[in-house]
């Protein structure tokens, strides 16, 4: 079975071990308990793995799947597949431009709308990886992004 969604993951949860930050595992309202209430079956096992240790945990086979922020550079570095949250358990990372009314000219609003439409979670993750993993200057990354608009 190819895993594409959280629903797919829930269907095999009883057979796999989930790695996640200890705080997520213990969070009753937005962590493991809430996920199980929302999507279904319990996992065969869980193991606490903090974000900075996911790469090592993958190499060691500590768990079968991991809870990771979609913008974490480990996603690109380890070539992780992000599953679709098909029931919207967790809102996506979103960039929103806020303007005060006096400066919100139609041209500025249109420009910010174009930027916002291009700043997808995947694109943000790529830019963060370029900065964090490759050491590229954030200004260089930002300018390269703006050049694509």
Predicted segment positions?
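Paired acidic/hydrophobic, glycine-rich loop segments that form the ligand-binding mouth/hinge
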Residues: 63-69
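Acidic/histidine-rich, surface-exposed loop or edge segments in extracytoplasmic proteins
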Residues: 91-97, 121-125
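Bilobed "Venus flytrap"/periplasmic-binding protein-like clamshell domains
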Residues: 1-55, 122, 135-140
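Short amphipathic alpha-helical coupling segments at ligand-binding clamshell hinges
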Residues: 104-115
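Solvent-exposed loop/turn segments at secondary-structure junctions
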Residues: 23-27, 71-75, 102-105
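A bilobed periplasmic-binding-protein/Venus flytrap-type ligand-binding module shared by bacterial periplasmic
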Residues: 1, 93-106
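Extracellular/periplasmic juxtamembrane helices and adjacent flexible linkers that interface
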Residues: 113-149
């Amino acid at each position: 079975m190819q895993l594409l969604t959280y629903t797919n993951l829930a269907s095999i949860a009883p057979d796999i071990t989930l790695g996640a930050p200890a705080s997520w595992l213990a969070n009753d309202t937005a962590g493991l308990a809430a996920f199980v209430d929302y999507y279904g079956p319990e996992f065969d096992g869980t193991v606490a793995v903090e974000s900075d240790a996911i790469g090592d945990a993958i190499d060691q086979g500590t768990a079968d799947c991991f809870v990771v922020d979609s913008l974490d550079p480990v996603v690109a570095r380890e070539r992780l597949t992000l599953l679709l949250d098909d029931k919207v358990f967790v809102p996506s990372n979103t960039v929103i431009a806020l303007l005060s009314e006096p400066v919100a000219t139609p041209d500025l609003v249109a420009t910010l709308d174009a930027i916002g439409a291009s700043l997808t979670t995947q694109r943000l993750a790529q830019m963060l990886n370029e900065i964090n993993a490759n050491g590229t200057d954030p200004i260089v990354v930002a300018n390269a992004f703006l050049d694509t608009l």
